[in-house]
Amino acid sequence: MLCQKYKRGVIQHALSPERKINNSRFPKWQTSCLGDYFTEETIRTSNSKSTPLVSLTVEDGITPKTERYYREFLVTKDGDNYKAVKPGWFAYNPMNAHLGAIAPNHLGYTAAVSGYYNIFSVNEEDTIYFWEEYLTSYPMLIHYKLIATGSLIEKQRVHYSQFVKICRCLPSVEEQRYLSKMFAAINAKIANAETMQRQLEKMRFSLMQQLFI
């Protein structure tokens, strides 16, 4: 979709240390480590009505499990086998970090994810959208691939202990807030455009049906 291509172009430009914003009103980007901005969260929980089990996907981030999953693969193990991910917290899959399996919880409620995942919060809550885009940007995916450990390709992973030690040239927290607002606005516009497109498709389908009745 054109909106997504536009978003990728804007984000690629915005995340380049060489670009200038408003006559360089922000400080020069400095090298720092990811662990300086995150706090690991480890709250054990279970798959319940208060903390329903969700998926972490490369395409859509954190999403509710499908009805089919609950019908066919409902987990019945006792105990707290999962980790809680509160709204705004990130879930991180070490096995698929290089594919972009890192995402914040935008569902609006606390959910449960696989106990294998790492959960972390950002120290500055108003930078969530910046980190959502930065951590899954193309240069970062390449970086994860380069530092992944494991003898077999299909079992390579980037442990959370490696992840937090990644040092990159990063914008100041002030600029992170600015970029976060910009990315959030872009996401909202894209969501509205996609909703409108779905409505138009439904209208088109309905009209086509009426034509051939």
Please annotate each region the language model reported.
Residues T42-K77:
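DNA target-recognition patches
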Residues M95, A111-Y116, S151-E174:
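A short glycine-rich beta-alpha junction/loop motif
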Residues R25, V75-N81:
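Short, conserved secondary-structure segments in the cores of folded domains
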Residues M1-P27, C169-I213:
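Amphipathic alpha-helical coiled-coil/heptad-repeat segments
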Residues I21-S46:
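Non-catalytic DNA-recognition/assembly elements of restriction-modification systems
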Residues D80-Y138:
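A short beta-sheet element
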